[in-house]
Amino acid sequence: MIESTTSHQDFQQRSMTGYALEHPSYRVRGALFRHQDDGRLLSGTSSNFFHVRSSSKITGCGGDLEVIHALELERSQHTGLPVRVTNVVVFGSNDVVRLIQPIEGTEDVIVNGDYHVSIVQSVELFESSTVSKSRILKLPGKIVAVNAEKHSNTELLLVFLLETGLYHYSFCAQTSDHFQCIQAFRCNRPITSGLLWRDSGLLHVAYYDGFVRVGVVHEQYDDMLLVKRVAVNRNNLSVLLDVVFEEIGRIQKFEDTEKQRREDMLTTSKCLSDKLVSEEEVVEGDTATEDFAKLKVDFKNQSIRCERVSQRLISLRKLITIIKSYMDMNDQIEQMIALLVDQLEELEKLEQLCDEVQKTGNQNLIGKSWIAVEEKRMVVDELIAKVNSDQIKKHSAEWGNKIDQIIDQLNGCSESAKDMRMIISQNIFEHRGDKKDVYTHFVLDSQSRDITLYCLSGLTTLAIYPRKGKRHTSKTTNIRKSQIFRVASISLDASFATCLTAACAMKSAEGVYVADQNAVFPIYFYSEKRYLDAGNQLQIPAFDSISSILIEPHQMILGSVTGGLLHLSFDFASNYEHFVVASSMLAHPISSGAVNCIKLLATGESLLALHCTDAEVVVSEKDQDRWHRVTHHTGGAHSIAVTPFSVDERGSFAVVASDTFVRLKALQYAEESLIGLHDLGESRAEDENGHPIEVLNVSLDPSMQYRQLPCKLRYAVGFSDKAIRTYVALLTGQHDFTVTEKFIAQIEPLFSVQNMICFHGRPMGCYVSCAKTLQIWNDLDRHQQKKLKSERMQLLKLSSSVTSMERTEGFLLVGFADDRLSIYEEKGNGAVDLVGTIENWHTGLNDRSVLGLRTRISKTSCGTRLFIHSLTAHHIVIHTVLVTSSKIEQHDFIVAHEHSMSQPIGFEFVSYKYFEFLVYGRGISNEKLSIEDRKRMDCFRDFEFN
């Protein structure tokens, strides 16, 4: 569609912040963030807690950020045109964005995935860019919560609540290694959800590890500073030694102070215990009990602190010994280098003297001078060999390993795991719920009258808030101002039990919004009455699986699994009704839920995609660079097989596999560009007890084409009862879409039907992989006889498990779990011959199993050229093979293209474009080879004129 904009308007749009002529990718949006300054929207993937500002938006698709300008959102909302975005590549396919939050005191944002975190500068949000890998940190566990604090113009303090504990990192922009772990507490119970926030420098934590716990973390900034100084000066031994001696002096002073403090605490404890024992009645205003409880906390904190200090002292003394030994080694190296410099100077003088003797013509002197020069060169070469010896390189590597071990001991990474409660200096709240009641989200509402912490599960909502105390005036939140807290809770009916995907605090009233995959529920909080009330489900139009929420006064934006953005406007008259007065799609989702399978059909004028999820089967059409839904059928599926699109008949047949049955569908493309998807019927199989058998996969006879009805359709279905059944569907009548099943054969029970592909033939045959075997079967229907057994034409026993299969014109490709791929050639008699095997398929990658094979083939006079593609978690690996006379004549690895889809399921070729692919999973991503990679592929393309 062509927009009617003048060049002046186009220039103004291009100059907008966050504007680019790119279309949004259809990947999961799990984090929505409004930028403070200019109204941009940033989008990421699912998160547990959102910092929402009042003026701008950022969204994240997969491992990237999408920046959408506020005017672009308004334009899309009014015109229905696709949202144009600025794409910032952060994690790519390595991770998915889970949280976007600002860094206080800066215009930058911190972005984290499941295991990675990155600092994204504000200038990178103005145009499409890629975040430097030096600003991406991989953490030792799954990230639960993140907190970032500015310490100086070049330094940040980052705190990560991981599944395995609490970690502090320093980020310094001026060092080559930006990130450095400076303090770590490892816990022995996995933390599944949580939240971090600061108040006046104090770090607060709320988490769930079977218990809901809230407390204040005791941070030792002097210890963090020591680790940082050791890391910075790790290669400057003299300065490092001074740092160590200074720290030992500080520890000795600390020991003297703590000894006296412990004696005072013991004296106080004895007095309090005697007082508590002697008192028969509690005297009003007596604080002995509270003082004794506080003293117990002080004893615990001191014990933990003294234990860490003693371990630090042992590590520092060990470091002194290591430094001294390496200083001696460095002195020896410096002496050798000084000696080498002296010898080089002497060699230079001898060479000058030799040149002067050469001018005299005295052969005797010339000979002696050259002998002296050669002897000196031998001495120099020997010294150079010593300086460059492997021993010195080994010495340098050992120093790096030892200093890393010392740093891990100082920051706590090498310590044994402990109870998380031991690192909390003050326990604020603790709650144990039902074992089935797992708390997945924590939300801190700092905008309400009283600071309130919400702990959310699929069944229960807890609200923790102070009983007394004035509203804190600073921007930070202090939940410790009052030591007494009220707790309100609501347990929903079991029918409401759900798995929450997103949650956020309300703006117009006290409470929270919670969302599962399909709906949004308000939970209102009446703090004065200590009462929580679950409101009615929001009435929203049909939408994708919800993955994120951005709430603003009287409006809401929902993000979905396949890239959708839904805007809702509420009635201003009431803060509690949340009646939706308007809704509009800012970005259309490609489907409802994750894509299980996709098939592309080229119609001549456009490109169609037939894809399925757990909830529906969808037909989408590509208009330039934008995919839009055309029609859909309810009912989920996990596998699709289609006939090639018939340009003459304007249609295609599809076999769609659901859990326990197979549906036949006809896709018709009318002359007036109307696309229809018609249900023709279904087939299923039952066991001896009449229970339906689970369907694993389907495949069509490749000779099948779309024809006018009545016609026949041959297909095979793999079932979970270790059998493959083949069918002929008799499609009768022009408009009466019914299926008559003609049972032909049941293949003998197999060990396991893992991969199945039909091939040409009368009878039709199937390639079947079963663990470490490849079987080839033919159906005996030569004379249209019924219920005859199938015949196994060939059985190949393999050395490794089969992970994928692909059939192309005359060849069968088999991928294995041990990084190999074998090519077989079809012989036309129901058998295949091995052409060759390619070892080390994933060159330079960590992947082993060869998955998701797709092949392009071209036949020339010199042989058959195969371009073989396979999918890994992060790459599309491309090889080329030339087959001549049933042998591999040439094999070359071309490229490993890094795609942007996290946790992909599969991929398909885009018709007529050898450099373009559609990767699918939680959404879809259109991938294109770079110009350099295309040129590399063109080097192997055999051009011939026929």
Swiss-Prot record:
Keywords: Coiled coil. InterPro entries: WD40/YVTN_repeat-like_dom_sf, WD40_repeat_dom_sf. Residues 326-363 form a coiled coil. The keyword Oxidoreductase does not apply. Gene3D superfamilies: YVTN repeat-like/Quinoprotein amine dehydrogenase. It comes from the Eukaryota. May have a role in tumor suppression. This is Protein dct-6. It comes from Caenorhabditis briggsae.
